[in-house]
Amino acid sequence: MIIKNIPFLIAEISANHNGNFKLAKKLIRCAKRNGADAVKLQTFTADTMTIKSKKKYFKITNGLWKGYNLWDLYNKAHTPLSWHKKLFAYGKKIGITIFSTPFDETAVDFLEKLECPIY
């Protein structure tokens, strides 16, 4: 996987799948085709990131997500847990490493069960 003195290129998918599983797979294919060694996901749910609140402290007041509250943003941006196993298998099938950044202890436990190679 990692060879001394050779760059290991990682493509970050993050929320760029826009909630579309087919697009997530397409992004993985594109990463592979363009020379990436691995694709990184993010593992979290809205509930593990914040609380569902409409109070002003949880409202985004500027930028791309202006008007959203934090819970809605994280709910929109997350990679569904039900996709992870399928995306890991797809990566293995086409020959690219898939891994993820866990945002909390439950995500670490989840990734351990999937035998995530690194996080």
Where are these regions (language model features)?
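N-terminal amphipathic alpha-helix/helix-capping segment at the start of soluble metabolic enzymes
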Residues: 1-11
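Structural preference for beta-strand elements that scaffold enzyme active sites
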Residues: 8-10, 38-40, 97-99, 117-118
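Conserved, mostly hydrophobic/aromatic
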Residues: 12, 31, 111
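Active-site beta-loop-alpha junctions enriched in small/polar residues
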Residues: 14-16, 42-46, 103-105
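Glycine-rich anion/phosphate-binding loops
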Residues: 17-34, 80-82
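Catalytic domains of carbohydrate-active enzymes, especially glycoside hydrolases
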Residues: 26-44, 114-115
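Glycine-rich, proline-tolerant flexible connector loops at the mouths of alpha/beta enzymes
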Residues: 37-78
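Active-site beta->alpha loop and helix N-cap motifs at the rims of alpha/beta catalytic domains
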Residues: 64-119
